[in-house]
Amino acid sequence: PSLLPDDRIQITREMPDWQNAIRMASAPLLDNGFINRNYIEKAIDMVETDKRFIMIADGVIIAHAGVDDGVYSMGMSFLRLPEKLSFNGYMDADIIVVLATPDKTRHLPALYQLFDLLEDEGNISAMRRAQDAHEIARLIRKYI
């Protein structure tokens, strides 16, 4: 099974504040039992306090919390916003990938595949132009 299936990829026309953007991006993982609400709030706390985020490409961040913060199984979700949003005043992003991992190593292969995908600016542009989640999923499946 794919680590990032179509039903965990969202495109929104809304412009929430950054905390709600992380909540929206996390919703598919919460709804499918990969994480609990605590994980989402801890991911928000990390941006607010520790600045422990991973900005992996221009306008693309990975939101995550710790392995002990309410993760039940490994998964990813994806949210594309209509334009870049300021995250706590120190980074701007319009693509949020939420990564949930129950240990410190199992997610690394998927993370490296995601880096490969995002290394090509053309892929990021294609994700920004995509009309629906299926288009984004097709692109991601080539890598992850």
Q: Where in this protein do the model-derived segments appear?
A:
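Cytosolic covalent-transfer regions centered on His/Cys nucleophiles
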Residues: 1-144
